[in-house]
Amino acid sequence: MKKLGIHVLILFIIFGCASTVEQLRTKNRENLLRLSLGMTKFDVLQIMGTETIESVNNPYRVETPKGKDGSLYEVLFYHTDKKKKGDLITDSELTPFVFKDNELIGWGWAFLSEVVPNYQYQIEVQ
């Protein structure tokens, strides 16, 4: 019985200290405040992180859409919000970070739609 108690305690310590997706979202929102325009992609990745928690990658995804000026942009999407219950992460729960020539030029859906007007993203309609 004593061994069982020790095993339960060890499991509690291991899983009690594990990061959750909610902690990841909170950390991403806090780290967002540390960013500034002109930072390199490397600097942003250092601040925002690149870990995977509960099968959620950070950044969640990376895309390279073509902008209205014909240039290719690199967009890193970070999980920052929770809009609905469940495990499915929707675009409305992500914040896009937009890079041109390895330099952060802006973030947010409004900014992305300015530089890539035809970008197709899915916002769930209620």
State each model region's role.
Residues M1-C17:
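Sec-dependent bacterial lipoprotein signal peptides
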Residues A18-Q126:
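Residues within mature, well-folded domains
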